Design a protein with these regions (language model features):
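Hydrophobic transmembrane-helix bundles of small-molecule transporters
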Residues: 168-280, 286, 304
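Extracellular/periplasmic helix-loop-helix junction of adjacent transmembrane segments
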Residues: 40-68, 107-110, 302, 307-312
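Helix-loop-helix hairpins in multi-pass membrane proteins, especially solute transporters
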Residues: 75-208, 225, 230, 234
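Transmembrane-helix exit segments and adjacent C-terminal regions of multi-pass membrane proteins
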Residues: 1-31, 253, 272, 389, ...
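Interfacial helix-cap and linker-helix signal at transmembrane-aqueous boundaries
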Residues: 44-45, 76-77, 162-170, 223, ...
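Central cavity-lining transmembrane alpha-helices of secondary-active solute carriers
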Residues: 60-74, 125-129, 314-327
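Helix-breaking motifs and short loop linkers at transmembrane-helix boundaries and internal kinks
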Residues: 47-49, 81, 102-108, 170-171, ...
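12-transmembrane solute porter fold
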Residues: 17-32, 37-39, 52, 233-236, ...
């Protein structure tokens, strides 16, 4: 089997303190990157002359590439060396960040930030886990795992605030320039990294890898193409689901023939592992839906600056960080299944409270979101603290690395799926509401209704009311007021529809939580601390 624990004993780094800091910095950049993009949506749209749907497609695509290639990337590290995979991952991220600094159009963002940067992310996470395991021993190893995990948690908590401040006070491009500086500093410490030799079987299941890429890619790209009004939606979705079925068949076939599969299908014989993977996916779908819908609402509807949006999102991110930290320290006092069930319940309650507030919130009452978002964030924090260990607990030590890779891929796919589906439903709802409200209007002339609906369907998604008023400057006052009214009514409705994605994900997770509680607890068969990075 390809993904095995390395039997070679770890060797202590020559400068463990500095190497630990550099690895933590790499993880910080990995997590903060998407937060920066989310809170900068309106600025990126304006600066590049593109659309909100285009930028959110790039965000979803970056998560998709990371998910689709993370399994094969871990095998590449086994084959060519974990240090090389780590270096290529850093370089991929650097290329993506540099492209964002210099980008003049959306195509550059998609090619270099989403695709190249996504490939970099898929290489970084599995190689970092192996390198930490191979460069540190004993207490030092546990300390570095804690440092890197803390860096990820802190980045998730303060990323929206950092990104919002830089974007509002200076420019969003500076945030990505700072990422380049951090990555350069991390690359300067490559001499401290000792490569970790892999002594297992050096073969890669290329057919299985292709099926996994087509399965994830077909589903998410189908949703993104639907969002953009493309005609290949059915074909892409069919490719995705057929590839998923072929992947399952192929893995079982290779296992029975004694050949090396991309993933050992017997991993899924464990019911806790299957339910845990599902929970991981639901958690990330919920997070992805919130990540894309709320920043767009805050910036494009309430017209908050990036900093204002970051501050409004702070209750979500800070409560997630605080509760995850607290729950992690108190682990063992409650059954993990009970905590997971409570986590999904809190996410569902938080989203349920947000949905009716959306049409009632004005720019000066955005703080109404604070309590619901804090509740949802607390739920996500509970899930972050428990799901990873629950999922991996039934897996034997020699297969834990492979299982952690599957867990990471499921989470990344869930994030990309949530981003894509929530964004697509929001735009579909916008199109429907624009058309319906324009046709029902008693103010707009009959000959203009179809034209207004078409214009709003194409342009209103990227325009604030202020920008729309400027564009309508030559129209009669009553026409201006009516179009602004349509804009005001359609957008909150669209956000409410988008929020059904995280709500449904939380409810499915809650259902799974009840199933978990009815099952007996599983005592971990391996030390899971080092695999906390994969959650």
């Amino acid at each position: 089997m390809v993904a095995q624990a390395d039997p070679a004993a770890p060797a202590e780094s020559e400068n463990p303190g500095r190497l630990g800091l550099l690895l933590s910095a790499a993880m910080f950049v990995l997590v903060v990157d998407t937060s920066l993009m989310n809170v900068s949506i309106s600025a990126v749209v304006e600066d590049l002359g593109t659309t909100v749907s285009g930028v959110q497609s790039a965000i979803a695509l970056e998560a998709l590439v990371s998910a689709a290639f993370i399994l094969i990337s871990s095998k590449i590290g086994d084959l060519f060396g974990r240090k090389l995979a780590y270096t290529l991952g850093l370089l991929g991220y650097a290329v993506g960040a540099i492209a964002m600094v210099l980008a003049q159009d959306l195509r550059t963002v998609i090619i270099f930030w989403a695709i190249v940067g996504g490939l970099g992310a898929s290489l970084l996470l599995p190689s970092m886990q192996s390198l930490i395991h191979g460069n540190f021993t004993g207490i030092a190893q546990r300390r570095v795992y804690a440092m890197v995990g803390a860096a990820a948690a802190i980045a998730a908590a303060i990323g929206p605030l950092i990104g919002g401040f830089i974007t509002t006070v200076l420019t969003w491009r500076l945030g990505f320039a700072l990422e380049v500086v951090v990555i350069a500093a991390v690359l300067s410490g490559l001499g401290l990294v000792k490569d970790v030799k892999f002594t297992g079987e050096r073969r890669i299941d290329l057919v299985g890898a292709a099926f996994s890429v087509f399965a994830m890619g077909g589903v998410v790209l189908g949703i993104l193409v639907w969002q953009e009004g493309g005609e290949a939606v059915a074909a892409l979705l069919a490719i995705g689901f057929i590839s998923l079925g072929l992947l399952a068949w192929w893995l079982v076939r290779r296992k029975r023939r004694g050949e090396v599969p991309l993933i050992d299908p017997t991993l899924f014989s464990s019911k806790p592992f299957r339910i845990g993977i599902s929970g991981q996916m639901m958690q990330q779908i919920a997070l992805g839906g919130l990540m894309i819908a709320l920043p767009i609402f805050l910036q494009m509807v309430l017209e908050y600056t990036a900093l204002g949006a970051g501050l409004m999102l702070a209750p979500l991110s800070l409560s997630m960080f605080a509760i995850a930290t607290l729950a992690g320290r108190r682990a063992g006092r409650r059954r993990p299944a009970v905590i997971i069930r409570l986590g999904f319940a809190l996410v569902a309650i938080g989203v349920l409270l947000v949905i009716p507030l959306v049409p009632r919130i004005e720019p000066d009452t955005g703080w109404w979101l604070a309590i619901p978002l804090a509740i949802a964030g607390a739920g996500l924090g509970l899930l972050v603290s428990q799901l990873n260990n629950y999922t991996l607990a039934p897996i034997e030590a020699e297969r834990i690395s492979e299982a952690a890779g599957v867990n990471s891929a499921a989470g990344s796919f869930g994030l990309s799926f949530g981003l894509a589906l929530a964004g697509s439903l929001m735009l579909a709802s916008l199109a429907f509401n624009f058309t319906t409200l324009a046709n029902d209007s008693a103010v707009l002339p009959p000959d203009d209704k179809e034209q207004v609906a078409t214009v709003l369907n194409e342009d209103a998604e990227v325009m604030s009311n202020t920008a729309l008023e400027a564009q309508l400057a030559g129209e009669p006052p009553e026409i201006q007021a009516e179009i602004i009214r349509i804009n005001d009514e359609a957008r909150p409705r669209a956000l409410q529809v988008a929020l059904l994605v995280p709500l449904l994900a939380a409810l499915i997770g809650l259902f799974n939580g009840f199933r978990m509680v009815r099952m007996p607890d599983v005592k971990p068969k391996a030390d899971l601390e080092e695999f906390a990075l994969g959650g």
